[in-house]
C-alpha cells in the first residue's frame, strides 16, 4: 500500500521535442489514416499548415512522466505485479512537429480494491505554456493492498 502522504505528490516537467520522423514512425506503426497526420500536401492545406501528431501520440511525450511515477522508489510499487488498467485523454490543441512539450504529473489516488492496489496519475502537457493534453493513467498492483 502507498503511504497516504504521497497522494498529491507532483512530478516535475519532462521535455519532449516533437520530431517529424517520430510522427512518421508513429503513423506507420499505428496505421493512422488522417491526412493531417500523414499527408504533407493535405496537412499544408489544412488548418494547421503542417503535419500534426495523431492525438494518441500523447503516450510518446507523456511516457517519461509516467515512468517517473512508476519507478518512484518512495512509492514502493511492486513492479512485477503491476499491470496497466486504463488511460483517458483530453485533447485540447494539436501537437505539431517542432513543438517542445512539457509534461507534469500528480499522483491522484491510491486505493485498495479487494486485494489489489489501484493507482492513478494525472498528467498535463503544455506547449508554450498552453495546455495541449491532459491524461489520467490507472495502474493495478495485483495483491498490492494486502
Map each language-model feature to its residues.
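HotDog/MaoC-like acyl-thioester-processing domains
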Residues: 1-2, 90-146
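Low-complexity, intrinsically disordered segments exposed to solvent
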Residues: 84, 88-90
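Hot-dog-fold acyl-thioester-processing enzymes
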Residues: 1-84
Amino acid at each position: 500500500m502507498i503511504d497516504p502522504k504521497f497522494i498529491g505528490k507532483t512530478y516535475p516537467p519532462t521535455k519532449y521535442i516533437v520530431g517529424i520522423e517520430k510522427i512518421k514512425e508513429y503513423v506507420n506503426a499505428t496505421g493512422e489514416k488522417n491526412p493531417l497526420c500523414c499527408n504533407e500536401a493535405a496537412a499544408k492545406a489544412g488548418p494547421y499548415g503542417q503535419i500534426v501528431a495523431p492525438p494518441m501520440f500523447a503516450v510518446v511525450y507523456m511516457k517519461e512522466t509516467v515512468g517517473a511515477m512508476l519507478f518512484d522508489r518512495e512509492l514502493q510499487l511492486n513492479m512485477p505485479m503491476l499491470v496497466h488498467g486504463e488511460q483517458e485523454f483530453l485533447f485540447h490543441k494539436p501537437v505539431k512537429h517542432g513543438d517542445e512539450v512539457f509534461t507534469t504529473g500528480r499522483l491522484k489516488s491510491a486505493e485498495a480494491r479487494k486485494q489489489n492496489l489501484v493507482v492513478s496519475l494525472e498528467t498535463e502537457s503544455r506547449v508554450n505554456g498552453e495546455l495541449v493534453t491532459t491524461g489520467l493513467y490507472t495502474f493495478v498492483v495485483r495483491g498490492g493492498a494486502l
